[in-house]
Amino acid sequence: MSMRIYIFLLTVCFTFQMRAQQVPDWENPRVVGINKEEYHSTLTLPSGKSSCEEIVSLNGRWKFYWSPDPQSRPSDFYKNNFDVSGWDNISVPGTWQLQGYGKPIYTNWTYPFKKDQPKVTGEPPKHFFSYENRNPVGSYVTTFDVSEDMKDKQLYLHFEGVKSAMYVWINGKKVGYSQNSMAPAEFDITGYVNEGQNRLAVEVYRWSDGSYLEDQDMWRFSGIYRPVELWVRPKIHIKDYSLTTDLADDFSSAGFKAKVWLRNLSDSKSGKLSLEDLL
């Protein structure tokens, strides 16, 4: 009898474990990022990016395939031998709804999908666009070059904004996952790239469990809607900073304080550094 109970409990535990493993990241509130860099203060003003040698723009025309739901997406598209030559071209940055894929949705009083938190693929009313299009997926592919002088640098892939969730691959290898539509996402891709041409694949989901929070009175678009950049940084660089001012009682003057966090990814653990400021 005890053996039967043991086998039953083991079967139940295995079933629950399998169900937990089948929950996608974009419907799992415990997962908001995988292998993603920590958030930090703005390191470069937008007006100075065009003249910054450490920032390489990856904006342009990317290969693109739109799927009405996750089940019909090309799941192997990230592989190096997957042929995307017959795919459409899409502008990045840009939402895919304004480029002929799917439909823009405006709502100010209800969710544009079935309310079943944290799920976003349940069956909504038949008049909903999401009734026949359960969480559309956009598959993006592009290439970029890594020069010889970049190989001794630290390389970061920087997305300024992607709605609503995305997976990233470099040269067929999974780099990570991110959601949080209104904030940047960065990945350290130093160990994923080769000298010469590299293949970047991004899989974007229109909805995620984060969409329950991103429910303002607004038009609902999706895609890689803000710039994508390759950040080429030295092995020792500023990771983050904090700036504060202490005002005098009469507000006639103020003391300026700066805290700077450095990241050292070089082989040298000691040395002399200088910090310059321009006010």
Enumerate the predicted regions with their spans.
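Beta-strand-rich binding/interaction modules
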Residues: 170, 253-279
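Accessory beta-strand-rich segments of carbohydrate-active enzymes
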Residues: 25, 30-33, 48-49, 63-67, ...
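Short, charged, solvent-exposed linker or helix-capping segments at domain edges/interfaces
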Residues: 74-76, 213, 238-242, 273
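Bacterial Sec-dependent N-terminal signal peptides
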Residues: 1-22
